[in-house]
Amino acid sequence: MTTPPSTPGEVDLGAYEAWLFDMDGVLTKTALVHAAAWKEAFDAFLKEESARTGKTYAPFDPESDYEKYVDGEPRADGVRNFLAARGITLPEGEDSDPPTAATVCGVGNRKNDLVLAVMKKQGVQDYEGVTELIAALKSRGVKVAVVSASENTVAALTAAGINQLFDARVDGHTVKDLHLAGKPAPDSFLQAAKDLGVDASRAVVLEDALAGVEAGRAGHFGLVIGVDHHDEGDSHAYADQLHEHGANVVVRELTELVSH
């Protein structure tokens, strides 16, 4: 297919060999959980930093800062990105650092502990249309993979009851083990396509993050679908951004892809 479709109604579910799904904000309603956990972890650190240095305390914004610095990024990269924007550099530390440690790993571990606690208490909900879309794809012989920077991918998908649906998984552990660059680099999506034995031009990327659709474009995937779950008032502006950053098609719900 030389010209990708530009509207949901033009998407042929059987036209590509594989679909590669981001997790947070596409498959599962965990993006808000992650944003809140990042805020609590960063704000605790920033308050400590303010008390230590006398700098004005400015809290983490769970919308703009989340989207700009941490959404779709491996945990350590998210810590580095945000703190660099605040002019703060921390020692890397070790994976085993306690959540109170003033290191990249320590701040990341604090955030991770918060996410796991919320998932354990509240569970994880998948978005409407996930199981229907994947069933429709599989009925056409299409392979599906989940691609996420989260090291909690299996836990989140299992909690949502959809872990068994995927033919391949590239997650935060894969990224770390294979030294893959984070989004907007296309490495994680390219690895998923490789694991499925499919050329990037014959695969679809589904992403809600701007860095994610950029990764889809950078990897020369056959089709990049942006998923915009923003409220109606914010939707058009974000949909435009998704298009600008590389999405061929933008949907508000996955049901739009199976309802035609």
Each language-model region and where it sits:
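Short glycine/proline-centered loop/turn elements that form peptide/ligand docking sites
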Residues: 131-135, 209-212, 224-238
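N-terminal helical cap/lid subdomain that shapes the substrate entry/recognition surface
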Residues: 4-5, 9-23, 27-128, 139
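Conserved SAM-binding loop
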Residues: 27, 146, 205-206
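Substrate-recognition "cap/lid" segment bordering the active-site pocket of phosphatases
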Residues: 142, 151-204, 210, 214, ...
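Short amphipathic alpha-helix with an adjacent loop that forms part of the alpha/beta core around
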Residues: 10-11, 256-260
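Short acidic-hydrophobic, aromatic-tinged amphipathic segments that line or gate anion-handling sites
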Residues: 249-256
